Amino acid sequence: MPPKTRSGARRGGRRVVKKNVAAGHAYIKSTFNNTIVSITDPHGAVISWASSGHVGFKGSRKSTPFAAQMAAENAARKAMDHGMKKVDVFVKGPGSGRETAIRSLQAAGLEVSSITDATPQPHNGCRPTKRRKV
């Protein structure tokens, strides 16, 4: 009996489907502890993402601007493999990696057409965290 042949994906792995998307949105969520960059198509389907922890930083190093830069470059590189050229950037949160992440998206080769600050503002909602005693 002849051996069975496999067609399609390799065993146990995921098949990477190349999407051909020219423009999309980049969402940068920058908290005090981490920075997460998600790049989507115009409909909101995620094409690529990266975070400071995903790139390899641990602990307090995740909150640095350099970690945000590496995460944004990683996400931009993956998105450009799918044909992405132009992004609208939406920034959320008070973290230290906001501006660095935007600059590294541009440096990676993506054309940034607009930057929007989408940080949620409470209308006297949850109580904020207490002041640090250093």
UniProtKB/Swiss-Prot annotation:
* Disulfide bridges in this chain: none
Composition-biased stretches (Polar residues): 113-122
List this protein's GO terms for biological process: translation
Tell me which InterPro entries the record gives. Ribosomal_uS11, Ribosomal_uS11_bac-type, Ribosomal_uS11_CS, Ribosomal_uS11_sf
- GO CC: one term? ribonucleoprotein complex
| Stretches for region Disordered | 113-134
Tell me the subunit arrangement: Part of the 30S ribosomal subunit. Interacts with proteins S7 and S18. Binds to IF-3.
User: Protein name, please?
Assistant: Small ribosomal subunit protein uS11
- Origin organism is Corynebacterium aurimucosum (strain ATCC 700975 / DSM 44827 / CIP 107346 / CN-1) (Corynebacterium nigricans)
Q: Which gene produces this protein? A: rpsK
